[in-house]
UniProtKB/Swiss-Prot annotation:
Protein source organism: Pseudomonas aeruginosa (strain ATCC 15692 / DSM 22644 / CIP 104116 / JCM 14847 / LMG 12228 / 1C / PRS 101 / PAO1)
Protein family membership: Belongs to the FapB/FapC family.
Function as written in the Swiss-Prot or TrEMBL entry: A minor component of the functional amyloid in this bacterium. Probably nucleates fibril formation. Upon overexpression of the endogenous six-gene locus (fapA-fapF), cells form large clumps during liquid growth, make large amounts of biofilm and produce amyloid fibrils.
Protein's cellular compartments: Fimbrium; Secreted
One Gene Ontology term, aspect cellular component: extracellular region
Record's protein name: Functional amyloid subunit FapB
Gene of this entry: fapB
Keyword presence, Iron: no
Claim: Signal is one of the keywords in the record: yes
């Protein structure tokens, strides 16, 4: 009788997984993993049409100048309900240096982490083109209609604990989310 119960339970679990084969496709998870030193970039995507970017630009010299231009565009046709989850759990991603994490689950999430550092010994001017580097465009490129489904994002208190340096994290679950972290540092002698 115990074998029959165990067998029926196993078939029930398999049947529930087969009932929604897409459910696991929209789940991104980082658990108790990853230590780093120096520059570390991580893009994790679950689902469809995710756009993620981690950019690091460093310039050193008498007239050092840094810049980066990133554009993401996406047209979504989301008509099916989507359940999505993104989680960072346990003592994940602890270290020192520059860390960029993009974690997206669902459909059509756009994420950017940008870090720019310039070291120079000459004066520099700050004009509109430099200021525009840190602007996230507000043009909506996601789904025009709401898409039903449950979404969840979680980050454990132990994640990133003890990290030093620059930590940039974008974490989203759902449809058409846009997030951006940008940091520009200029050091002049």
């Amino acid at each position: 009788m115990k074998r029959l119960s165990a067998l029926l339970l196993a078939f029930a679990c398999i049947a529930s997984l087969q009932a929604d084969p897409l459910a696991s496709r929209n789940r991104a998870s980082i658990d108790d993993s990853g230590t780093y030193r120096g520059n570390f970039a991580l893009n994790q995507a679950a689902g469809d049409a995710q756009q993620q970017s981690n950019v690091r630009v460093v310039a050193v010299g008498s007239a050092a100048l840094v810049g980066s231009d990133q554009r993401q565009h996406l047209q979504l046709d989301a008509s099916q309900p989507i359940a999505a989850s993104a989680s960072i759990s346990g003592a994940a991603l602890r270290g020192s240096g520059i860390l960029g994490v993009n974690q997206g689950a669902g459909l059509g999430n756009q994420q950017i982490n940008a870090f720019r550092l310039s070291l120079s010994n000459g004066p520099e001017s700050l004009d509109d083109s430099v200021l525009a580097q840190s602007v996230a465009l507000t043009k909506v490129s996601g789904s025009a209609t709401p898409v039903p489904g449950g979404r969840s994002v979680s980050t454990d208190d132990r994640a990133f604990a003890g990290s030093s340096g620059v930590v940039q994290v974008n974490q989203s679950a759902g449809v058409g989310n846009q997030s951006m972290n940008t940091l520009s540092v200029r050091v002049m002698e």
